Design a protein with these regions (language model features):
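Amide-donor transfer/coupling interface in amidating biosynthetic enzymes
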Residues: 5-193
């Protein structure tokens, strides 16, 4: 879970959201700012540590790209961590998985570490594994991204409603420029790509 900053604060998709917020990222995915920009996309939200979270197509609207996981619930990362712990206990991994970054409090980390030690001991003694500690860890977890994610989706839905033609054969309302539907280029508000 990484702290992010809005790079284009006046973009309509980012209207009335926090200028700094957290977002979970996959540890296996990274498309750099340079790669996004070389593809003609505009980076809207990014993190020094986690990289780009959100970018849009050159028209600023038609295609929206999320590299983070704004859709995650509070316990989504906990479920992924649990999966990795059990992969370790089943011998698929050679060491216990790291905690999800910036997600577990110090206390939650100690609880998780203690569980791994107890599970390792149970395996050595040929006993059943103890139940994973979701009930104990869950209340210690914070969701620091959900409200912002909902606001972005709501902004997008509002723009779709405002711009889309009622005639399903036509993409936009009459008078909407398909290359600049948000009029960002016309207003000089479009960041250079």
């Amino acid at each position: 879970v990484y702290s992010h900053r809005v790079a284009v604060p006046r973009h309509p998709l980012l209207r009335e959201i926090n200028t700094r917020f957290d977002v979970p990222h996959s540890r296996y995915n990274d498309i750099s700012r340079e790669q996004f920009e070389n593809a003609g996309l505009t980076v809207l939200v990014e993190s020094e540590e986690g990289g780009v979270h959100m970018a849009v197509s050159p028209d600023q609207f038609r295609a929206i790209f999320f590299q983070g996981h704004p859709e995650y619930d509070t316990n989504s990362l906990l479920k992924e961590y649990k999966r990795e712990v059990f992969r370790y206990l089943n011998g698929e991994l050679h060491q216990p998985p790291p905690f999800p970054g910036h997600y577990f409090s110090e206390d939650a980390g100690q609880v998780a570490l203690q569980y791994v030690k107890e599970a390792e001991k149970a395996l050595r003694e040929d006993r059943p594994l103890p139940d994973f500690l979701e009930e104990k860890l869950g209340p210690q977890l914070d969701n620091t991204w959900g409200d912002t994610a909902k606001a972005i989706v709501n902004n997008w839905l509002g723009l779709v409603y405002q711009l889309t033609n009622l005639d399903r054969q036509l993409q936009y309302m009459e008078g909407i420029d398909p290359e600049d539907p948000l009029k960002m280029k016309a207003r000089g508000a479009c960041p250079p790509t």
